[in-house]
Amino acid sequence: MQRDDALRALVASRLAAWQLHAPDAAGLKQAAVVLVVADEGRGAQLRGLRQARGWSTQAALILTRRAKGLSGHAGQWALPGGRIDAGETPEQTALRELQEEVGLQLQPDDVLGRLDTFITRSGYAITPVVVWAGAA
C-alpha cells in the first residue's frame, strides 16, 4: 500500500508543478481523454473491471481498441475519451467517458491533474486528464 501512495503522490506532485500550455482553441471541437494510472495491479482486480488474463503486474495505463467497423480510426488503440458536453469540464468528461467506454467508474477525487491540451488536424482541442485507479 505504501508504494501505491508514493506513486500517486509523485504523479500528483509532478502534475501540480507542470506549467500547462493552453493553445488557442477558439472555434475547435473540445474533447478530453483519460489516462488511467494503476499501480502494480492486475486489471482483473481494479474497481469495476471484469477479470482479464495476462495483465502485467507493473504500473499501467488503460487503452481501448476501437471497433473495426467504425468509419473513423477503425481498429486503432486509443485512450478512453470523447467530446466535452455543454457545461462539462474536461475532468467530468474524462470520468464520464471512462465509465461509458470501459465500465470503470472513478470519482472526482481520483483526478490527479491535466496535461497540455493539444490541437488535432481534424479540428479538435483535446485535453488529457490523469486519474488514479489505485492498486489491486
Q: What are these language model-derived features?
A:
Residues 1-78, 82-136:
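N-terminal leader/linker segments that precede catalytic domains of diphosphate-processing enzymes
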